[in-house]
A protein has these predicted regions:
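Glycine-rich FAD pyrophosphate-binding loop
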Residues: 25-48
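Beta1/beta-strand and adjacent pyrophosphate-binding region of the FAD-binding site
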Residues: 2-16, 33
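Short hydrophobic segments within beta-strands
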Residues: 11, 35, 95-96, 144
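Dinucleotide-binding Rossmann-like beta1-alpha1 core, especially the glycine-rich loop
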Residues: 51-131, 137
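Helical element adjacent to the flavin cofactor pocket in flavoenzyme catalytic cores
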Residues: 141-154
Length: 154
């Protein structure tokens, strides 16, 4: 643990640097410096962020990535709600474009179930079109927990 009287320097004011600075302030650190070479924050990688809050569909069950993804989406939604930042639980569809991809889709669905994703549904082509009329898929997975937020608002 860093003693609270020490100076902390964070290089880069993207979303990670700003989140670290915020965390240190909350933890009671007083002497924090954020250094950014650009004239505004989040000018590089953070500005290319799609804003997706991932539910953890793709990660190996019981892996650190799966665990952090599940924990992270809950924390992120809570943070946004508490700070009046708009976010949307819009869901996501992962589609198989042909019969060859259906087996991989079914394996991905099983992985999502093992990662405790809520409300996962396997879809046929007609069910896909209920959500996305112009998506041509033979089968799909509906992931209702997937959400989006504006990185800039965060």
């Amino acid at each position: 643990m860093i003693p609270k009287d020490k100076e902390i320097v964070i290089i880069g004011c993207g979303i990670v640097g700003l989140a670290l600075g915020r965390k240190f302030i909350i933890e009671g650190y007083k002497n924090i410096k954020l250094i950014e070479k650009e004239t505004s924050v989040a000018s590089h990688q953070s500005s290319r962020n799609s804003g997706v809050m991932h539910a953890g569909l793709y990660y190996e069950p019981n892996s650190l990535k799966a665990e952090l993804s599940r924990e992270g989406i809950v924390l992120m939604k809570d943070y946004c709600t508490k700070n009046c930042i708009e976010w949307e639980e819009c869901g996501k569809i992962v589609a198989a474009k042909d019969k060859n991809e259906i087996n991989r889709l079914e394996n991905l669905f099983a992985r999502g179930k093992r990662n405790n994703l809520k409300g996962l549904r396997l879809l046929n082509g007609k069910e896909i079109n209920f959500y996305e009329p112009y998506l041509d898929g033979k089968a799909g997975i509906y992931v209702p927990e997937e959400s989006i937020v504006s990185y800039f608002d965060v």
